[in-house]
From Swiss-Prot:
This is Uncharacterized protein BH2278. SMART domains: Flavin_Reduct. Pfam families: Flavin_Reduct (PF01613). Belongs to the flavoredoxin family. InterPro entries: Flavin_Rdtase-like_dom, Split_barrel_FMN-bd. Keywords: Flavoprotein, FMN. GO terms for molecular function: FMN binding; oxidoreductase activity, acting on the CH-NH group of donors, NAD or NADP as acceptor. It comes from Halalkalibacterium halodurans (strain ATCC BAA-125 / DSM 18197 / FERM 7344 / JCM 9153 / C-125) (Bacillus halodurans). Its cofactor is FMN. SUPFAM superfamilies: FMN-binding split barrel (SSF50475). It comes from the Bacteria.
Length: 209
């Protein structure tokens, strides 16, 4: 099948992309409005950008009317956010939080999640997540869209603090088996941590022997 993206609708492109780019990690993001309301929302258009400095990027799609979502607006106005890793223990609550509440209502309270103070940033963290990345906003870039109207806001954050549960921290890294992370697939499907295998990176000398 050969398909030209320019001849497809936004929905058709979206379906192909989320079915082809997977599994995708989930960033469960808390932000805070100027009024002090804590917003929480999951995003799977998310990944690491650089390790030095530690930067992460999240694409936050715009609302149907073209205005920024709470996460992007709060991030730009307050300049901070917290990313929570989604695992098998908290994924149900994360899914509940995706309901589109008005800005003056908190998804944290609606989903029955527990706010705890963050170490460095003013935005609260959530106790239900065993790995948390506290971030300062580096940039918010409007991207995509047609006719001059952006389709999303690309939120770039610099990690200023890692909060990792003691039982997950192993040899300077993360024990993935103990974490049991959850990823997004296509449609309403999610992926669990399952079968893995390792491959040593080849060297030029090995390949020429």
């Amino acid at each position: 099948m050969k398909l030209n993206p320019d001849s497809l609708s936004r929905k058709e492109n979206y379906r192909l992309l989320i079915g082809a780019v997977l599994p995708r990690p989930i960033a469960f993001v808390t932000t805070k409005s100027k009024a002090g309301v804590v917003n929480a929302a999951p995003f799977s258009f998310y990944n690491v950008l650089t390790a030095e400095p530690p930067l992460i990027g999240i694409s936050v799609g715009r609302k149907p009317d073209g205005t920024p979502k709470d996460t992007a607006r709060n991030g730009q106005e307050i300049g901070e956010f917290v990313v929570h890793v989604v695992d098998e223990q908290n994924v149900e609550a994360v899914n509940v939080s995706s309901i589109p509440l008005p800005p003056e209502e908190s998804e944290v309270e609606y989903a029955g999640l527990t706010e705890v103070p963050s170490e460095v940033v003013s935005v609260p963290s959530l106790a239900e997540s065993r790995i948390r990345l506290e971030c300062k906003v580096e940039n918010v870039i409007p991207i995509g869209g047609k006719g001059g109207e952006p389709a999303a806001d690309f939120l770039i954050g610099r990690v200023v603090h890692y909060e990792v549960a003691d039982d997950l921290f192993q040899d300077g890294g993360i024990d993935t088996e103990a974490l049991r992370p959850v990823s997004r697939l296509a449609g309403n499907e999610y992926g669990k941590y399952g079968e893995t295998f390792s491959l040593d990176r080849p060297t030029i000398s090995q390949n020429r022997e």
